[in-house]
Amino acid sequence: MSIRPLHDRVLVRREEEETKSAGGIVLPGSAAEKPSRGEVIAVGNGKITENGDVRPLDVKAGDTVIFGQYSGSTVKVEGEELLIMSEAEILAVVED
């Protein structure tokens, strides 16, 4: 099964959770913060403007993005947890 986001929605795979604190303490699953970074897997066609034009998204598949801790909706696809969020919920694109 594959998912194709609609309009200005973006499908993101969250980075792996940190299992150790900065001081080297192993964190249990409930205490580990969910990362606010991830890889864009797929994007919608774009945002429909008031005059009916379609504005393409600024992010593309393969981009690494930073988003808010509570951004998006979690979906499970073939056993993998992914996030679907609006492009507006993305705070930045990580550039190397």
UniProtKB/Swiss-Prot annotation:
InterPro entries from the UniProt entry: Chaperonin_GroES, Chaperonin_GroES_sf, Chaprnonin_Cpn10_CS, GroES-like_sf
Keyword Chaperone among UniProt keywords: yes
Gene3D superfamilies in alphabetical order: GroES chaperonin
Subcellular location: Cytoplasm
A biological process from GO: chaperone cofactor-dependent protein refolding
Keywords: Chaperone, Cytoplasm
Main location: cytoplasm
A GO term, aspect molecular function: unfolded protein binding
GO terms for cellular component: cytoplasm
Pfam families reported for this sequence: Cpn10
Family per similarity comment: Belongs to the GroES chaperonin family.
Role of this protein: Together with the chaperonin GroEL, plays an essential role in assisting protein folding. The GroEL-GroES system forms a nano-cage that allows encapsulation of the non-native substrate proteins and provides a physical environment optimized to promote and accelerate protein folding. GroES binds to the apical surface of the GroEL ring, thereby capping the opening of the GroEL channel.
Assembly, per entry: Heptamer of 7 subunits arranged in a ring. Interacts with the chaperonin GroEL.
Name of this protein: Co-chaperonin GroES
Organism name: Alcanivorax borkumensis (strain ATCC 700651 / DSM 11573 / NCIMB 13689 / SK2)
Lineage, highest ranks first: Bacteria, Pseudomonadati, Pseudomonadota, Gammaproteobacteria, Oceanospirillales
